[in-house]
Amino acid sequence: MSNSFESILDRPVTEIDRPTLVPVGTYACIIKNQPEEDKTRMGTDMLRFVFWITAPTEDVSEDDLRAALTREDGSLKSLQEISVRHQFWTTPSAAYRLFDFLSNDLGIDGGSKKNPKSLRDMLMEVIGKEFLAHVVHNPSQDGKTTWANVDRTMPLG
């Protein structure tokens, strides 16, 4: 089924599911799209990455993961259907965090002293990059929802 606005509005309410909350732990992930530019509630510019999970590591509970992936009808979602988000503030004092992620965790070459790349140049190379992401659970501001957030990333190899 399509995910267009119209098709979502036409979907029977019995087919609407909450996003899957994967268990806390470390997951192998892949980037399938360019990050989106956005702003925080306070107006700070940021880049939002969406990571798709490809596999759990040994610190993820198999029982908790199976429970999280089980639909109401008993069938299992594919882990590859699950994504998590991670933001980087795009401020002068936080730019190093984005650079560290791109160079250290994704292995994107930043160029040389004589011919350095810009962060924008490096961002053009993110699609298809794999890495590890550690997922934690955080409550929403209103306390009604729990979100799976990435608190740190690491190189895969």
Segments and roles (model prediction):
Residues 1-157:
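Short beta-rich binding modules
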